Amino acid sequence: MLCLVYNSILCKQRRISLKVLQQFRCWNISKTFLSYRTLTALAIETSCDDTSVSVVRTSDSSSHCQNEIICLNTHRTISKYEAYGGIHPTIVIHEHQKNLAKVIQRTISDAARSGITDFDLIAVTRGPGMIGPLAVGLNTAKGLAVGLQKPLLAVHHMQAHALAVQLEKSIDFPYLNILVSGGHTMLVYSNSLLNHEIIVTTSDIAVGDYLDKCAKYLGIPWDNEMPAAALEQFASPEINSTSYSLKPPIPLNTREKVHSASFSFSGLESYACRIIRKTPLNLSEKKFFAYQLQYAAFQHICQKTLLALKRLDLSKVKYLVCSGGVARNELLKKMLNDTLMVLQFEHQPTDIKLVYPSPDICSDNAAMIGYTAIQMFKAGYTSSFDVEPIRKWPINQILTVEGWLTKKNKKV
């Protein structure tokens, strides 16, 4: 049904200029913005290998805002890349092209069974991420927005991770955000929807990339999981008499570098590769080494987080939020919780709470894209139809890229 509507409208309007479409769409946005307290988004996320589509609804009242994930469908293809040791850039595009329409169809059907047959906006990830996969999702979203005459919201992927916790929990700004994934490792002070100050970021590779490579070096089967998740399942803290030498050094832990405002994981990766290639390891030693490789990386993250917390005005910070795919790791959660206990003991009494999204919302997903799009729409922003995917896009520069429009059709 959606395809029929899309084709019909698109055929009628194919001669209409982009300018006319934008003017019509802006009028429709203003009308919707003024009259609706409930907003529903159809959202698409294709920044890496997962093909994810969701319908998200927010309902505002005078006292609170209720958020609801009507449906979320994510097609995972990670098993196809184990033979390549990572995401294959050509195959991943083909998989998105093959699967996206089917996932959209399933999501729309699921939403219809919940009584939702119309959407107020079309949301999609614009970046940062892999250009090919992003383009598949972005072009599909543009077609849906034009065909259904709905506003387009092209969302910042890491902004969505930073806001993901608000989708499920009543958490207000400001809060400190640890964003840990395959492409990013950042400590961010999230002050508002658009104000995200980078406190610490990685100087080389991301922690998720590091963990994925460690799993590859150790030859751990992925079992339809991300390599980092397979590493977590494989690891064991149990030690024997031959394992003491398998404890990697904590990065940037010297007197000269311990206070530096950066993460670094490339040295740990080189250490892991060197030990595994030169040292024969039995199964128990591999399991212990896998645990220690995680521990060293997470201890590094915790040290920098503790340093940042000591420097911040803690009277304004109520939450330490951990988001992104690596935030699913149970060892990381435990170590961050221990870090807050150290802060209480060393620094000052504080009621900062460690919170994180549910596992499915930690990983790449369209629900967080839909929620973020709705918040941007409420703030008066939409996206033009000529927006292009962005590979690198700092979270503290959300509005600096071309393609944002205000309610009066003015470019930002």
UniProtKB/Swiss-Prot annotation:
Disulfide bonds: none annotated. The keyword Transit peptide applies. It catalyses: L-threonylcarbamoyladenylate + adenosine(37) in tRNA = N(6)-L-threonylcarbamoyladenosine(37) in tRNA + AMP + H(+). InterPro entries: ATPase_NBD (IPR043129), Gcp-like_dom (IPR000905), KAE1/TsaD (IPR017861), Peptidase_M22_CS (IPR017860), TsaD (IPR022450). Substrate binds at residues 179-183, 212, 228, 232, 328-329, 363. GO terms for biological process: mitochondrial tRNA threonylcarbamoyladenosine modification. A divalent metal cation binds at residues 157, 161, 364. It comes from the Eukaryota. Binds 1 divalent metal cation per subunit. Transmembrane segments: none annotated. Its EC number is 2.3.1.234. It is found in: Mitochondrion. Its cofactor is a divalent metal cation. SUPFAM superfamilies: Actin-like ATPase domain. Homodimer. Belongs to the KAE1 / TsaD family. This is tRNA N6-adenosine threonylcarbamoyltransferase, mitochondrial.
